[in-house]
Amino acid sequence: MKGVRMKLVYIASPLRGEILSEKDYSKNIKKATEYCEKACSLGVLAFAPHLYFTQFYNDTIPEQREKGLEMGLSMLEKCEELWVMGKNISQGMRGEIAHAKNLGIPIYHVEMPDDIMYYPVSADNHALLGQHSCMPDSRDKDYMGKI
């Protein structure tokens, strides 16, 4: 589709835990891929830094890991939202969350990322209702006739 602008969303999910095994690493890469696929199916452009930067930086080499984290934070600055996937927040994710807060980037915590219904986009591909969607004087006790 020509001329359609998609919202750029940064996907934060664990790459490695406290103890990294090859099995956990592969599982986390697979999950990040699934999260991006689901997010893209909702009409956003999803970016997970650990899917991209691990193609040429080795996360087990400290200097290369730091370079990948630095580049990820630089990419986060260009994103419109940060989606934090799951309940397990890694050290890298904590840095991403702190950076997004400092920049004023909206952060959405998707506690159950395996179920697309919990993603912060409605079924009709529009953003979920936010403060701007509320009715004027919505603190009134009587809403009759105002909708």
Task: Enumerate the language-model features and the residues they cover.
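Conserved catalytic or regulatory cores that recognize and/or transform ribose-phosphate-containing ligands
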Residues: 1-147
